[in-house]
Every structure is written in C-alpha cells, then in structure tokens.
Design a protein with these regions (language model features):
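C-terminal trimerization/auto-chaperone modules of long, extracellular attachment fibers and adhesins
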Residues: 1-21, 26
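Short solvent-exposed loop/turn micro-motifs enriched in small/polar/acidic residues
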Residues: 6, 37, 124-127
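Short, surface-exposed charged micro-motifs
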Residues: 12, 43, 131
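Exposed extracellular interaction/assembly regions and N-terminal maturation sites
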Residues: 18-105, 135-153
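Terminal beta-strand-rich extracellular "head" domains
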Residues: 103-124
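Extracellular disulfide-bonded cysteine-rich modules/repeats
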Residues: 126-135
Length: 153
C-alpha cells in the first residue's frame, strides 16, 4: 500500500515493497536546452528536486566539480539507504571538459565521481548525455557513479 505525502503542489507517493506499473512512466524534464547550467567557478550545480532529467548548455570552461543537491521541496535530503538517478542532457561544447570532483548536499565525496571506465568522458561539440547515480548506503557512506554517452548529433 502506498501513502501520498509531500507539500501541497509537490506530492510524492511512498511505497514500501515492490511497485508494479502497468503502463508508461513519464518523467518531467527540468530546464531547456538553451538554458545555461548554473556554474560557480568550475563547479556545476545539479539540483535534483525538479526532475530526474535536466537539460541545458555548458559554458566554455572546465567542469571540475559536480555539486549535487538532493533536497526535495521540503528540504529533505537523501537518507541512509536511499539513492537517486539523474541524467544531464547537455548541448555541449568541447571546451567544457568534465572532471570527477564531487559534492552531495555540500559534503565532499571521497574519490569524487566514479566514472564507468575509470575516467570522465570527453566533452564533445554535440549533445552529451551524462547519467549519475547518487547513493547513500545504510551506514551513510555516499558514492556517486557516472556514465557518459557523448557525441549525439
């Protein structure tokens, strides 16, 4: 049995156990391809409250650090034993290199993003799709796993 929770206008369904969906699952997309991602220096902000899929453009500078915010509309962040998957669809440029530094909710993540293949993907001048799993295990240890599919044209 599920329970509908959350603030007015931002409800969430909490389910303990399996959930079987008999049709399509449609996700909300946050932002627009023409919108610049929020950058401070060489740190890109990745908010997860709005949607699991975020699109935008990158500046012509290196992205050294990925700053994930897992807070929902009520300010609740990932609890122990929870994870979230977020996909960035980037109208990219090859000058915006991707790094592996990482924070989650303002806290440094030891070893940064653990990329598939061991290294960050190379940025391209076409569309790059980067997917991240932000995971907090039962003891509170946070890891971030990244996968890059690049050069869609």
């Amino acid at each position: 049995m599920g329970v509908l929770v959350g603030p007015s206008g931002s409800p969430a369904l909490e389910v303990d156990g399996a959930a079987v969906l008999g049709g399509r699952v449609i996700e909300k997309v946050f932002s627009q391809f023409s919108t610049n991602f929020s950058m401070t220096g060489n740190t890109i902000s990745v908010p997860t409250a709005g949607a699991n899929t975020v699109c935008g453009t990158t500046p012509t500078t290196a992205i050294n650090t990925w700053a994930f915010s897992t807070a929902d509309a009520d300010g609740n962040t990932l609890a122990n034993g929870q994870s979230i998957t977020v996909t960035l669809i980037i109208d990219a440029n090859s000058a915006a290199t991707y790094g592996d530094g990482c924070t989650v909710d303002g806290n440094n993540v030891a070893n940064g993003v653990q990329w598939s293949g061991g290294s960050p993907p190379l940025a391209t001048s076409n569309t790059d799709i980067l997917s991240f799993i932000v995971l907090k295990d039962g003891a509170g240890v946070v890891r971030v796993y990244g996968q890059g599919n690049t050069d869609f044209s």
